[in-house]
Amino acid sequence: XXXGLXIVDAFVQPNLILQGDAKVEDNGXL
């Protein structure tokens, strides 16, 4: 998420940090 877990999102989707962040925030609120 972008709200402080951007690093985690970067590991989840290193090629789609912004999009992955948005999806994680939207689906899991991470």
Curated annotation (Swiss-Prot):
GO molecular function: alpha-amylase inhibitor activity; carbohydrate binding
UniProt entry keywords in alphabetical sequence: Alpha-amylase inhibitor, Lectin
Membrane-crossing segments per the record: none
Keyword Endoplasmic reticulum on entry: no
Family: Belongs to the leguminous lectin family.
Function: Lectin and alpha-amylase inhibitor. Acts as a defensive protein against insects.
Protein's name in the database: Putative alpha-amylase inhibitor
Species this chain originates from: Phaseolus vulgaris (Kidney bean)
